[in-house]
Amino acid sequence: MESQQLSQHSPISHGSACASVTSKEVHTNQDPLDVSASKIQEYDKASTKANSQQTTTPASSAVPENPHHASPQTAQSHSPQNGPYQQQCMMTQNQANPSGWSFYGRPSMIPYTPYQMSPMYFPPGPHSQFPQYPSSVGTPLSTPSPESGNTFTDSSSADSDMTSTKKYVRPPPMLTSPNDFLNWVKTYIKFLQNSNLGDIIPTATRKAVRQMTDDELTFLCHTFQLFAPSQFLPTWVKDILSADYTDIMKILSKSINKMQSDTQEVNDITTLATLHYNGSTPADAFEAEVTNILDRLNNNGIPINNKVACQFIMRGLSGEYKFLRYARHRYIHMTVADLFSDIHSMYEEQQESKRNKSTYRRNPSDEKKDSRTYTNTTKPKSITRNSQKPNNSQSRTARAHNVSTSNNSSGPDNDLIRGSTTEPIQLKNKHDLHLGQELTESTVNHTNHSDDELPGHLLLDSGASRTLIRSAHHIHSASSNPGINVVDAQKRNIPINAIGDLQFHFQDNTKTSIKVLHTPNIAYDLLSLNELAAVDITACFTKNVLERSDGTVLAPIVKYGDFYWVSKKYLLPSNISVPTINNVHTSESTRKYPYPFIHRMLAHANAQTIRYSLKNNTITYFNESDVDWSSAIDYQCPDCLIGKSTKHRHIKGSRLKYQNSYEPFQYLHTDIFGPVHNLPKSAPSYFISFTDETTKFRWVYPLHDRREDSILDVFTTILAFIKNQFQASVLVIQMDRGSEYTNRTLHKFLEKNGITPCYTTTADSRAHGVAERLNRTLLDDCRTQLQCSGLPNHLWFSAIEFSTIVRNSLASPKSKKSARQHAGLAGLDISTLLPFGQPVIVNDHNPNSKIHPRGIPGYALHPSRNSYGYIIYLPSLKKTVDTTNYVILQGKESRLDQFNYDALTFDEDLNRLTASYQSFIASNEIQQSDDLNIESDHDFQSDIELHPEQPRNVLSKAVSPTDSTPPSTHTEDSKRVSKTNIRAPREVDPNISKSNILPSKKRSSTPQISDIESTGSGGMHRLDVPLLAPMSQYNTHESSHTSKSKDFRHSDSYSDNETNHTNVPISSTGGTNNKTVPQTSEQETEKRIIHRSPSIDTSSSESNSLHHVVPIKTSDTCPKENTEESIIADLPLPDLPPEPPTKLSDSFKELPPINSRQTNSSLGGIGDSNAYTTINSKKRSLEDNETEIKVSRDTWNTKNMRSLEPPRSKKRIHLIAAVKAVKSIKPIRTTLRYDEAITYNKDIKEKEKYIEAYHKEVNQLLKMKTWDTDRYYDRKEIDPKRVINSMFIFNRKRDGTHKARFVARGDIQHPDTYDSGMQSNTVHHYALMTSLSLALDNNYYITQLDISSAYLYADIKEELYIRPPPHLGMNDKLIRLKKSLYGLKQSGANWYETIKSYLIQQCGMEEVRGWSCVFKNSQVTICLFVDDMVLFSKNLNSNKRIIEKLKMQYDTKIINLGESDEEIQYDILGLEIKYQRGKYMKLGMENSLTEKIPKLNVPLNPKGRKLSAPGQPGLYIDQQELELEEDDYKMKVHEMQKLIGLASYVGYKFRFDLLYYINTLAQHILFPSKQVLDMTYELIQFIWNTRDKQLIWHKSKPVKPTNKLVVISDASYGNQPYYKSQIGNIYLLNGKVIGGKSTKASLTCTSTTEAEIHAISESVPLLNNLSYLIQELDKKPITKGLLTDSKSTISIIISNNEEKFRNRFFGTKAMRLRDEVSGNHLHVCYIETKKNIADVMTKPLPIKTFKLLTNKWIH
């Protein structure tokens, strides 16, 4: 606005420059209203300082900081205008002003404002100047500038000093709104203060210091007019100005008062809202304070009505006065006076009670007689958590005040109900009654009454939020509710047995009920006034009655002692009994930690010790109530049963007669354990333990030997530690009489330090019980930890140290404290603890290369003693490190799931437990660049030699006779022949192919499993109790772990625990590195199998129910309850048998160690649970050896005639290079050439059949006019690139007929001779399987057709020439093609376009979009595969009509019309199908396999044992380089091509259970080691043994006319080379398996969840395409389901929270998956891992697991 004014009017005529005024901003935290004399000098100094820092010159003017300031412009001189005030402009400075005078000094034109028309307004003349003040001392405005030293005198002097540097004060902003006037006044007052006019401004507390002058008044008026336009002034300001325009000071004074009044109002409201009164001050003072506040607010125009005022007052009441909240909050017409009357009454009664408190004080001797857990010396308060509320991070809080004694003081915590001024009913004893009340004791025998309790009455409690009662006699509708936990004021838990209703029947026949909690662990029955108020019942202590809000009296109140009571006669009894309450089944709370998890977390300590520790806070972070103890009583830990098996218990208290009482750390017990044999040299063989007699604090130290100096070093260390850390001196050390303690060196050391050695007497083992029991306990823990984690034996002392840390933190049942508490140390924070052996990933600070993985798999051992880190074992580095740079590996539970643990994993519990600690670590981490070489905090403590441990029973290696026979090619001459070594590059592209499932270079594996000590009798004691207790409450997440060994075989016996095996490698017994494990019978075998994903376990009675598959419902994907049931129904899922009790055989001895190999195989791989162990035995069941192939391939060269020749050059093959070259393999030739079939064929009969087939083919070619027979071309006349070589090929068809085919050599066809954009389409196998499945469900007729010489019906557009057939004898001539000859690049596409056009135009068909070669109309569906057609229709006549039309154009043969109602056999595209309409369909290849497999020259074992699985877990492909002769290598590759080619053909047709093994071996075609060949033979042997198996379909009988398409997905995390994951999917239509896929993930996944997401995302596109196909072929509605055993994946899919995807590698894929699931209406359901049939697609499985998952759909 100001800029516009400057541009519209001419500048003033005086001055040569227009300088902008700037100043330093005044601090915003300074209050401009504080204008007291003490602040004036401060503002003056600030103004002077600000002015001294700003300069303005004519050449450069400062940019104005105020947006209302005019931009600097050059002033121009003009002659004065005629008449006064004809120009308007902003008041501008024409020259610099002296310090102390701001914003005037030269004539200025002030713009007119409406109120300038006032008669009181006196405008200045055009040449008049602003007032000038005389330069006198003491005048603030006349202070000369320190820079110039001049005083502002006149305009001429000012003009002469125009160029001098002056300081200016920032003007106030323009007023823009009436609502902002008070804020503007603040800035205006600040402006006046900075202009040295602060002393003329009055404040709310004092008048102005001096009177203003006329010049100052003119200045105020002009500046006020300038910056406060009248249109923006408030009404009250305009009223003042209308009366006296110059009364600016009145406006400022009133504004200051208003602002201070507003501040006081805010303070009053804040004080009123934060009132607090507990009786510590007189009630009169409290009333006066509140009344004054209410009066001030009312006077300031803020009236507070009675209701609001009472609410403020009641909110501030605490202590005993809190009761008034409940007594008065229901009153509608409540007044402040009434409320204060009650407060005065309670205050007077409180004072009276204090004076007479000795009368009611409880006798201290009576307190000692109270033997209850809750002594009730103070009032306990209870906190209630309702775990049934999902997504509620804050617990519900309840206060249950349990009072048994009178309170000695008043305060906020003493929430008792006091009497009023009216005399209450006083009972001096239990027999004294008033008001005619009857004290009738309930017939129920109460427990634990307090002496001051009034029997038969309920204690009224004003502070309790819940009602508690000890007897079940009055509880209605009782049910257990363990989710509600109550604690008293001392934070002690009050166990709650049940929850129910407490029903009242009052004296006016009023009936009501409130909720009540049942517990026998309280001193009184508590009645919560809070819950009574919720049902409109209040306690009036002036009348001593319970009444309703309308004043209706319900029951009298009795005062007995210090408390108020209500009789139980108003309670209605129930029929429930106390045993019924106590025996109600406790349901599982999902928010609680399962006891097995805590049991394992705390080193497998017993439940009693853990409970004592949690109750006494020796274990911190969570409470006893946070653990589900429902299974603790009958829970049997299998690892504890094995690791802690003992003969008998020690005698308790046996040492008391040998010693006196000592102070802490004065009496120590010590003992040495060892040696432990068969360990690396770096691992300790002994340990020495110390136990303090008083505190029971334990220390353990490792020892490598028992020499004197080693023992002395430990004693020196422990004594110094106790002296420095605990300021104590050891007086006595009790030891046995071992030589390590009785030697002279140690004796002198003890004597020198004044320590008395106390030795045990001979044959008195009881005297040394403390040390012996500690060693036994620690060893039990050690065995249990190693058994549970599966870590190698050389880490045994780490398990001892972990146990010691935990044991020192567990409370003793006898002392109720832990050793750490006795020693004065803080409790152990369990959030910093990890389970022993927990898989983690440790950051590699210095990798081998920038592309090398930065994470190293490891296993957590125990917290570090020397840092805040954790000791972690890294198998790949053979080290233990001390580091904080680790991440817990999700889904990994080491060997926790070995015994199934009732199908428990604890990922969610562990995440929840360590969340705060991890967040603390994360918040204190320093971000560092990955490219910098920074010193790591890794402390490599020991170099561990990881050589395999030798088992105690040496295993003999089984060698077949052929194994000892050396190959005939390895002769003396071969050593003298030079070798041509060919090496492949070491590093190759990891993405070799879509199904790359090969081992990479050696990586770390799971360390070997420790041996288990046998008992003295040579075997484990037989356990008559089951090792496993079913716990169906717990859900689990996917978990996988790696453990590698070659010493594994299948076990014939099988328990339900094995159903979760995953990622178990293929095994073979023929390899050179294999070791044969002695046979073990079923009765003598203990299954030790690591599960991939322990799943939800249910009770045996529900093993066959649908509850094994738990659907996850969402509003988007599952709109109806029965949708999930319909999806799961009819699926060929396995029926899980009930889990039998697992018993250990008497002959059970010891487990052989797992010989860990540092490899990463595709048949198991790192991160997978693929290890299991059998027990050594001389016997072995028949099925245990069924995967063994006795025929060795060492006789290979005996069949080769070239073996008689001198050895040739050898070729060295590297595994990775061979894998990379797999995709470039040329297919092997399965047909015969002309010379092989006819010219040189010595089989006369076969030769004649081939000749007949040859002539038949030639006649067909001539009949179809395949080439131009009118002219033969000379070869020289034709462009060579248009000449196509041709040949005859011969083969024998499946039906036994001999076939000849004249084909072109399309493999050498020039690119210019065909259109590369044309596609040769055939029906997709999934389309065929879908059509077959729909045909079975809809009773379709299936007709099979064949079109002879189909390609020859398609014309060829290009100009191509071929050589004539051989029988014509014209080798130098060429003929021009007219038809699409077989073999040409374009022939398939030409035929496809030809037949497609005919079917659409002539037969009325249409092709299904997205599914080539699938045609349909309203009646018929056609699947086309080159020249084979399969027709499906409801009416057979529809098929016949299509056939007639086809015969009109093509030579069509009906292979099978399909008109019979009996079983019909088809041979469709290699599948042998048995079909009976409306009943079943069976798909197999028995006849074809019976014919083909024997011709493969595979060493079959037809009379031997049959294989029960395609491969066995435990063996890894040796990655060492091969060195083979060139010819030998080519022959083996050729054989591998034949074998894998046949297996792939079978697997992708219908044997989907073999796809994992097929894909794995397919990657090793160019790496034909003896091991790979033997594994391939084993696969072919299994196919041969199961050649009669069929894919079985039965007609579905859906409840609704709908189709159900389901995909079951699974992933095996990180079990492939380069840490890639294997994914597998199985597709089912109406419960029938129609396809499967097993492949390696295209990207490296970082977690099991990401692998599962990748697997599901790979399945969704095909699922959607199949859905479209089904809807096109069958117009029924379709339901699409997606089943996975990963709950975390389901949670991500159904969640609407997108923040969890941030900083996640799989965020994009997960978001896309969520969109696809939502957009395509997919129903995402959970399936147990035990029932996940897709498991066979991702990993090798044990025999019984494999059978269990496949026997319902392949048999």
UniProtKB/Swiss-Prot annotation:
Highest taxon, organism lineage: Eukaryota
Reaction(s) catalysed (UniProt annotation): DNA(n) + a 2'-deoxyribonucleoside 5'-triphosphate = DNA(n+1) + diphosphate; Endonucleolytic cleavage to 5'-phosphomonoester
Location of region: Disordered: 1-86, 131-171, 350-420, 956-1120, 1146-1172
Chain residue ranges for the region called RNA-binding: 299-401
PTM characteristics: Initially, virus-like particles (VLPs) are composed of the structural unprocessed proteins Gag and Gag-Pol, and also contain the host initiator methionine tRNA (tRNA(i)-Met) which serves as a primer for minus-strand DNA synthesis, and a dimer of genomic Ty RNA. Processing of the polyproteins occurs within the particle and proceeds by an ordered pathway, called maturation. First, the protease (PR) is released by autocatalytic cleavage of the Gag-Pol polyprotein yielding capsid protein p45 and a Pol-p154 precursor protein.
Cystine pairings recorded for this chain: none
Binding site for Mg(2+) 1: 671, 736
Compositional bias of kind Basic and acidic residues: 363-372, 1038-1053
Region (Integrase-type zinc finger-like): 583-640
A single cellular component GO annotation: cytoplasm
GO biological process: DNA integration; DNA recombination; proteolysis; transposition; viral translational frameshifting
EC number(s) reported in the record: 3.4.23.-, 2.7.7.49, 2.7.7.7, 3.1.26.4
Binding annotation for Mg(2+) 3: 1610, 1652, 1685
Polar residues composition bias: residue spans: 1-23, 48-60, 71-86, 131-152, 373-412, 1005-1015, 1054-1082, 1095-1106
Range of residues in the leader sequence: none
UniProt cross-references to PANTHER family, sorted A to Z: TRANSPOSASE, PUTATIVE-RELATED, TRANSPOSON TY4-P GAG-POL POLYPROTEIN
Miscellaneous: Retrotransposons are mobile genetic entities that are able to replicate via an RNA intermediate and a reverse transcription step. In contrast to retroviruses, retrotransposons are non-infectious, lack an envelope and remain intracellular. Ty1 retrotransposons belong to the copia elements (pseudoviridae).
Domain notes: The C-terminal RNA-binding region of CA is sufficient for all its nucleocapsid-like chaperone activities. Integrase core domain contains the D-x(n)-D-x(35)-E motif, named for the phylogenetically conserved glutamic acid and aspartic acid residues and the invariant 35 amino acid spacing between the second and third acidic residues. Each acidic residue of the D,D(35)E motif is independently essential for the 3'-processing and strand transfer activities of purified integrase protein.
SUBUNIT field: The capsid protein forms a homotrimer, from which the VLPs are assembled. The protease is a homodimer, whose active site consists of two apposed aspartic acid residues.
Function: Capsid protein (CA) is the structural component of the virus-like particle (VLP), forming the shell that encapsulates the retrotransposons dimeric RNA genome. The particles are assembled from trimer-clustered units and there are holes in the capsid shells that allow for the diffusion of macromolecules. CA also has nucleocapsid-like chaperone activity, promoting primer tRNA(i)-Met annealing to the multipartite primer-binding site (PBS), dimerization of Ty1 RNA and initiation of reverse transcription. The aspartyl protease (PR) mediates the proteolytic cleavages of the Gag and Gag-Pol polyproteins after assembly of the VLP.
Protein name: Transposon Ty1-NL1 Gag-Pol polyprotein
